[in-house]
């Protein structure tokens, strides 16, 4: 409703919106269907460490330093990228929806 109200107030069509930023507490991560806005899974809250095995695989591959140099952030299950990788590996719809692109 908020987004609809803002679009209406701005006097634009929804197709003109190129992106949307959402702020949340810490590094909580969520994925949703861009066509209908429905979540594809429950959000992973910032302190959840379910992506620790993904981080271990990255560490074992020798790419942890590259992650740190590229992002400025040490590899961690709290890092949103590791949560996104968890969604990609564990929620059937996520890779399918992600591969569809914009």
Model-derived regions: residue spans:
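Structural signal for hydrophobic packing residues in well-ordered secondary-structure cores
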Residues: 3, 7-11, 59-62, 88-95
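Short, acidic Gly/Pro/Ser/Thr-rich loop/turn segments
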Residues: 27-29, 52, 94
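N-terminal glycine/serine-rich phosphate-binding loop of ATP-dependent small-molecule kinases
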Residues: 1-41, 65, 69
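Short alpha-helix plus adjacent loop in nuclease-associated cores
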Residues: 44-60
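Tryptophan-centric aromatic hotspots in well-structured domains and transmembrane helices
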Residues: 1, 45-46, 86
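Gly/Ser/Thr-rich active-site cleft segment
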Residues: 22, 49, 67-102
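A conserved hydrophobic position in a structured secondary element of the catalytic/binding core
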Residues: 32, 59, 79
């Amino acid at each position: 409703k908020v987004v609809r109200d803002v679009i209406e107030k701005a006097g634009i069509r929804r197709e003109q919106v190129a992106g949307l930023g959402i702020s949340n507490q810490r590094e909580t991560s969520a994925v949703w269907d861009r066509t209908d806005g429905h979540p594809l899974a429950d959000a992973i809250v910032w302190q959840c460490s379910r992506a620790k095995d993904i981080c271990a695989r990255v560490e074992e591959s020798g790419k942890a330093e590259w992650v740190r140099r590229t992002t400025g952030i040490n590899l961690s299950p709290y890092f949103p990228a590791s949560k996104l990788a968890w969604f990609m590996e564990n929620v059937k719809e996520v890779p399918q929806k992600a591969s569809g692109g914009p």
